[in-house]
Design a protein with these regions (language model features):
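Glycine-rich phosphate-binding loops of nucleotide-dependent enzymes
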Residues: 2-255
Length: 255
C-alpha cells in the first residue's frame, strides 16, 4: 500500500480531569520502527491502548490501512491486522512453545479453535496450514530446540521471545510492542533487538515500540517520538532527538 499504515490525528484521552493524551498526531510508514519515549506518566501506554482498542479516545481518529478503526473493539483490530505484546507476559506457562505459538492463530481460524480437534475436514486442513506457519515462526525466533518445552520452564528472555511469536501468529500488518526489553539482561536485549529488526526487514512489518532503554531505542528506531504529559513534544530521527534541547530537558537528561 502507499501512504501510512497507521495515521493518528488529534487524539485526546482524559480520565476525569487528568489528560492522558492531548491532540496527538502520529503516522507510521510501511516497514518502519517508530519508538515512543518519555517519562513515566507521559502517555505512551495510553496511546498504545488507544491504538489497540483497549481505550476509547474522546476526540480524534485512528486510521489503519485506510480504514477508520477509532471505535473498533480490540479483537476486531487484532483480526484487522494489529498485533500487540504487553508489559506483562501473555504466555501459557503449562503449554509448550509450539502450543503457545499456535494459540496466536485463533483470530485467523475460520473453522474455529476446535474444528481441527473434532476432525472436521475443513478444520484439519486449516490446522495443518497453521501448524506449518507456527513452525516457521519458531524457526524465525530460533526456538526449534525448545518447541516441545513447557514455556514455564524457560528463562524470562526466552519466554519474551515466545510472547513475540504469539503476536507474530496474528499475522499482523502492524506490531505494537510495550516495553519488550523490561526485565531482560544485556544478552537477552541484544537477541530481542535483532529479532525486532528482522521483523521489520525480512517481514516488512512496521512496529510501534514503547521502550525505556535508550540504547536500544537509538540503535533500532527509524524515528523516535517523544511524549511529555500527554503531548508529543518532538519527533525525528534518533540523531535529531539526541540533540533536541527540549527532549534533553524533559527526558534524556535524566538518563
Amino acid at each position: 500500500m502507499t501512504g501510512p499504515v497507521l495515521e493518528v490525528t488529534s487524539l485526546s484521552l482524559a480520565f476525569g480531569l487528568v489528560h492522558a493524551l492531548d491532540q496527538i498526531a502520529l503516522a507510521v510508514q510501511p516497514a518502519e520502527i517508530v519508538s515512543l519515549i518519555g517519562p513515566n506518566g507521559a502517555g505512551k501506554s495510553s496511546l498504545l491502548n488507544c491504538l489497540s482498542g483497549f481505550y476509547r479516545p474522546q476526540q480524534g481518529r485512528v486510521v489503519f490501512r485506510g480504514r477508520d478503526i477509532t471505535r473498533l473493539a480490540p479483537h476486531r483490530r487484532a483480526k484487522a491486522g494489529i498485533g500487540r505484546t504487553f508489559q506483562g507476559l501473555q504466555t501459557y506457562d503449562s503449554m509448550t512453545v509450539r502450543e503457545n505459538v499456535l494459540s496466536g492463530f485463533h483470530t485467523s481460524m475460520r473453522g474455529g479453535l476446535f474444528a481441527g480437534f473434532l476432525y472436521w475436514p475443513s478444520g484439519q486442513r486449516e490446522e495443518a496450514v497453521f501448524a506449518e506457519k507456527a513452525e516457521e515462526i519458531i524457526e524465525f525466533l530460533e526456538l526449534e530446540e525448545l518447541r516441545h518445552a513447557p514455556v514455564g520452564s524457560l528463562s524470562y528472555g526466552l519466554r519474551k521471545r515466545v510472547d513475540l511469536g504469539r503476536a507474530l501468529a496474528l499475522q499482523p500488518a502492524l506490531l505494537l510492542l510495550d516495553e519488550p526489553m523490561a526485565g531482560m539482561n544485556l544478552e537477552e536485549k541484544g537477541d530481542l533487538a535483532r529479532f525486532i529488526l528482522d521483523i521489520r526487514d525480512a517481514r516488512q512489518i512496521p512496529i510501534v515500540l514503547v521502550e525505556h532503554d535508550m540504547e536500544v531505542v537509538m540503535d533500532i528506531s527509524d524515528r523516535v517520538a517523544v511524549m511529555e504529559w500527554g503531548r508529543l513534544i518532538a519527533e525525528g530521527a534518533p540523531a535529531q532527538i539526541r540533540q533536541n534541547p527540549r527532549v534533553i530537558a524533559a527526558y534524556l537528561g535524566q538518563e
